[in-house]
A protein has these predicted regions:
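N-terminal, positively charged/glycine-rich alpha-helical extensions of SAM-dependent methyltransferases
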Residues: 15-18, 22-45, 49-50
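Conserved catalytic/acceptor-binding region of the Class I
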Residues: 172-240, 258-259
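A short glycine-rich, Lys/Arg-flanked "PGG" loop and its adjoining helix->strand segment in the class I
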Residues: 155-170
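A short acidic, Gly/Pro-enriched loop at the edge of an enzyme's catalytic core
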Residues: 132-142
């Protein structure tokens, strides 16, 4: 799919540290099982913007494949900077409505400012957490992108969210599967760093391969008519996107990587990592396959 450069997570928006959710705590202060392992200083927010731009097309494809259409009422949980809320708003149009919720006041301020600047009135944002937020007016769809990746009990989170769906409404999960990330042919430095990133996410309480399990999670949460598929990008040796994304996530996760003994600061060499990765990809004439962007959706029935 030309131009569909799919890369790591946002928890809470694009490859983030592969996630989108915007929490204000720094990653090193997080404990296993807490919902978001990536910090959100200005550099991290900028990285999330870059990541979101890269996975915008796959996200739009997956939302439309799930049936989202004009006039729908949509809830975006863990909205972060509002990237998914904006995409959903474009799909549902002015006859629909989108509400994005997130616990981060910092992220929501940015999301609101952007929506206002764009003159978008049918997309709004509220402070709230997926485990407690509720409304009396049910939604046609609830979207969680790069959300379940960071949650200790994703099944419970889906169950909690679906109480806000109408009968027949869809829960749509979009997340990464880091298990397939690799280069062809193999580039040793990239393989090492991707391995360190996956280990760091795991010890920090995230689930870096959760994309492969999304369908199972939705079924366990009681959803019916579950469907799932993934979108895979192939980045050319000359495309620095691969190096920039890998190095950006590694920089965010560096405290965990070093403090947990996954790799030393010298092995990581974070200040030169992007340039070294880019050079290795070109030297090996290697195509990079970033983590697969997986979508799964299912309906609430019997209400």
């Amino acid at each position: 799919m030309p131009g569909a450069h799919v890369v790591f997570a946002e928890p809470r928006h694009s490859y983030p540290g592969f996630a989108e959710g915007v929490g204000e705590e720094e990653m090193e202060s997080r404990k296993p099982g807490q919902p978001y392992v990536l910090g959100h200083d200005p550099l991290e927010l900028a990285r999330l913007d870059r990541q979101a731009a890269i996975i915008e097309r796959p996200t739009r494809m997956l939302l439309q494949a799930a049936g989202m259409a004009a006039g729908w009422r949509v809830l975006d949980v863990g909205t972060g900077l509002g990237h998914v809320a904006r995409i959903a708003g474009e799909i549902v149009g002015p006859t629909g409505a989108v509400i994005g919720i997130d616990p981060s006041v910092q992220a929501l301020a940015v999301a609101r400012e952007r929506a206002e600047a764009a003159g978008v009135r049918h997309v709004s944002f509220e402070e709230g957490d997926v485990s407690t937020w509720s409304t009396r007016q049910p939604f046609d769809a609830i979207v969680g992108r790069l959300l379940l990746f960071h949650l200790g009990d994703p099944v419970a989170a889906v169950r909690q969210s679906t109480r806000n769906l109408r009968n027949g409404g869809q829960f749509i999960a979009v997340d990464f599967d880091l298990g397939g990330a690799r280069s062809e042919p193999r580039v040793g430095l990239a393989a090492d760093v991707l391995g360190w990133i996956e280990q760091a996410f795991t010890v920090a309480g995230a689930s870096p391969r959760i994309g492969a399990r999304l369908g199972m999670i939705l079924r366990e949460a009681g959803l019916e008519q579950v469907a799932t598929f993934g979108v895979q990008a192939y980045l050319s040796p000359q495309d620095r996107t691969s190096a920039a994304l890998i190095a950006g996530v590694a920089r965010t996760l560096a405290p965990v990587i070093v403090e947990r003994g996954i790799a030393t600061a010298e092995q990581l060499g974070i200040d030169t990592l992007e340039d070294r990765l880019a050079a290795e990809f070109q030297r090996a004439d290697a195509v990079m396959l970033p983590p697969t962007v997986v979508g799964a959706w299912g309906a609430v029935t019997g209400r």
